[in-house]
Amino acid sequence: MFETILIANRGEIACRVIKTCRRLGIRTVAVYSDADAGALHVEMADEAVRIGPPPAAESYLNIEAIVEACRRTGARAVHPGYGFLSERAAFARALEAAGITFIGPPVAAIEAMGDKIESKRLARAAGVSTVPGTLDSIADPDEARRIAREIGYPVMIKASAGGGGKGMRIARDERELLEGIARARSEARSAFGDDRVFLEKFVEEPRHIEIQVLGDRHGNIVHLGERECSIQRRHQKVIEEAPSPFLDKATRKAMGEQAVALARAVGYHSAGTVEFIVDRHRNFYFLEMNTRLQVEHPVTELVTGLDLVELMIRVAAGEPLPFRQEDVRLEGWAIEARVYAEDPGRGFLPSVGRVVRYREPHGKDIRVDSGVVEGAEVSIHYDPMIAKLCARGHDRRAAIARAREALDAFLIRGPAHNLSFLSAVLAHPRFQEGRLSTGFIAEEFGERFRGAGLPPERLEEIAGVTVRLRLDRARREARASGKLPGWRYRPERDWVVQLDGVCFAVTLLADEDERSVLHIVDRHLEVAVDWRPGDPVVRARVTGSTFTLQVDPLPEGWIVRHGGAELRALVRTRRAAELAARIPEKVRADAGKMLRSPMPGLILSIAVQPGDEVKAGQDLCVLEAMKMENVLKAEQDGRVEEVRVRPRDTVAADQVLITFA
């Protein structure tokens, strides 16, 4: 076994690997860029080495610096995590040349599977089902048109060296084909230094289902079942689960056998994932093989009871797998939700900034993998994922319920985040029924998230909770010293709660230290809360139901977050509500007269010029930030007055890019 392992990564995956190494008694070395000098993975490791400035190309992708860090610290093995250098054959080869063990597959397997075109050839040769399409990169637009006509629209444009959703586009006609190839090549060139793209038939209503494989250096290869990864946005996975609610035993067995056959064909050892797309008839087609640990590996760990990182380390040390295929058992159900620093209300644009408050949910069968602590900075330079929240249940319904409750209790303040959006996805009837496809988010939520709806009964209960909070606050204030002699607390009887414009008349029937009895609409509610002033997380008990919500104070109430909804709750006495109704509301300033940059980044292109008439939703410019090309669109119809930036300009967060007349 290794004495010291260097983790060539950052964030939650570096922390995840360190935890397993600690349990195994292995010393760990972290590497970090200047932007990550105070990061959690640096703090957790036994030793840390600076490898360069913030840009990944000068730090986490710097092979020479990482090999030198191994030499300096005596690390005889490297775990690459995922992303960065994890699938770079040149990195594995450099470690091998330095006498350092790469905790991953052999170089030949990385090379074979790293090229999407070559991997498809190998898959066909190994008897794996593949999607109709070309096996060669596209030479020119004429060839692209010809191939698309042969296999039929829609087609998928894919970067040969691609991954993580980058360099991928769907084209439904010739115009989209030519535009998509140009955009995919640009994105692939920027992300991978390789602008080759190829075409394949796009499967309508596809599911994205992958098989986890694991092999040792002694020729033993097994699969650990599947993961359902169909909930995606712009080809990036958002929610994953194991097992899939769609597969039957026969399809699961066939997919597992083909995944193992492909792994065996390339002499694979370590952990890897064979990805398939599956149509509505359970026909499945090879997509790609990821020769590394996947982001979503925890759901497999939760249903198998295995530690994949430990097994990778033991395999790299030459140990055989301690079990065979017939020993693999899948028990229960697990769901993972990726928590991103992004703004769902602004087209899911990445968000940056300091994490002002951070507290993870805890409880039975809840797991959070994170590289963030309170006070950490979400940087422009790296992927905006904050954490992965995982929940396990005895069945799918129980796992979903546990995940929803945990999301409600997950406290994050600072950068914008997608917790409410994740809750809304899990609550959606179509998700709960398991009717999934990779188009689910686009079909059900569109390009921006405007909050989930809540049933009337839950709104009534939330109204009751906000009144109880108001009474609790008044009761605490009454206990403060310095009150006038003879003054004592007398709770108001009649209240009006306004939840985003919907008014509830609330009558206080009884008020005690532990609970309040309220009449709302036609219900008598017994309300109790577990809450400390200053803490946004509230545990509420309302006449037989228990739920969690978060509150942030307003002058006359709270911003309430629960179940994917964000509500403005104004809590007034009946008299105050009557007076407020007579006061005219202030007219808000028109913020639609300018387009501001949502984050620091680089302007790649501008699609408009002064005098142009634009429609709501029209593309205005492309901003490169956090490893992605983000298309900024018009909020409303209007006419361009001034364009204040040019392509290749570096812009700051909130900088005005375009103004409108």
Model region roles, listed by residue range:
Residues 1-274, 278-297:
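N-terminal beta-alpha lobe that positions the nucleotide/phosphoryl donor
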Residues 259, 298-526, 619, 653-659:
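Catalytic cores of soluble metabolic enzymes centered on carboxylation/carboxyl-transfer
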Residues 546, 552-598:
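Catalytic P-loop NTP-binding/switch module of NTPases
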